[in-house]
């Protein structure tokens, strides 16, 4: 089971001015229509005032548009995981408590992934020992979904190697498809997660993941074409002429 396809993976940074150096993933799920529109707003700000190589948001912005959204601790490229890798344990607690203040226990969850990686096992263990047991925040069982079908594995890895100049290591992350519940359970046991943190969190996470899937009732209106409305600067006959001007300028800057 996993829920990442139902929301937005944002790039979070505590200080937007340092986002280029501190980008990390943060999963946001639209529980309600208001939450969906708040994700739209976050996405807009991330791509305009928060664009530093990639779209980013910071905690003040997230706090402003948090209603109707469910958030999680996210994967091994999350803020907390990055802090763990840098041995900044106190910062992990501060960030976790910030998220609890913004979302509360009802809308903030601990993600456990079953990847057969040492870094994943360490992260899962810290999440349970330091945060699940102390704060009583429920777990989720999640998979990084990079492609839909398992048969897409080889193509995905080929593209990943191209993007990383051949430095991509496939070990431990060979099943990044949209996995079934049975596959997720098998991945958990294959990675030996139960020996480290206990299988009770696997079954708790499965039930929480199903609960979130039922709670997320936001609906996308795919039948209506909604064109953005914006003011056209003077000197242009209309929006089409202005858009063509922007496209031409953008193309010339890339050539």
Stretches found by the model and what they are:
Residues 1-255:
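Phosphodiester-processing cores and adjacent nucleic acid-binding clamps
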């Amino acid at each position: 089971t996993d829920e990442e396809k139902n929301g937005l993976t944002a790039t979070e940074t505590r200080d937007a001015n340092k986002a280029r150096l501190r980008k990390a993933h943060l999963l946001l799920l639209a529980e309600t229509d208001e939450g969906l529109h708040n994700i739209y707003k976050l996405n807009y700000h991330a791509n305009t005032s928060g664009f530093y190589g990639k779209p980013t948001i910071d905690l003040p912005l997230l706090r402003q548009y948090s209603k109707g959204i469910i958030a999680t601790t996210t994967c091994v490229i999350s803020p907390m995981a990055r802090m763990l890798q840098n041995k900044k344990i106190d910062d992990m607690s501060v960030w976790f408590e910030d998220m609890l203040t913004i979302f509360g226990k009802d809308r903030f969850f601990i993600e456990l992934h079953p990847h057969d990686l040492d870094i994943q096992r360490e992260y899962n263990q810290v999440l349970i020992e330091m945060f699940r047991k102390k704060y009583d925040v429920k777990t989720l069982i999640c998979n990084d979904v990079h492609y839909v079908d398992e048969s897409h594995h080889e193509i995905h890895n080929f593209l990943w190697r191209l993007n990383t100049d051949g430095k991509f290591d496939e070990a431990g992350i060979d099943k990044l498809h949209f996995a079934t519940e049975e596959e997720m359970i098998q991945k958990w046991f294959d990675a030996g997660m139960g020996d480290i943190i206990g299988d009770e969190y696997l079954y708790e996470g499965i039930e929480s993941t199903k609960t979130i899937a039922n709670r997320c009732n936001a609906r996308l209106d795919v039948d209506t074409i909604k064109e953005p409305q914006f003011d056209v600067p003077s000197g242009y006959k209309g929006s089409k002429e202005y858009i063509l001007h922007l496209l031409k300028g953008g193309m010339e800057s890339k050539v």
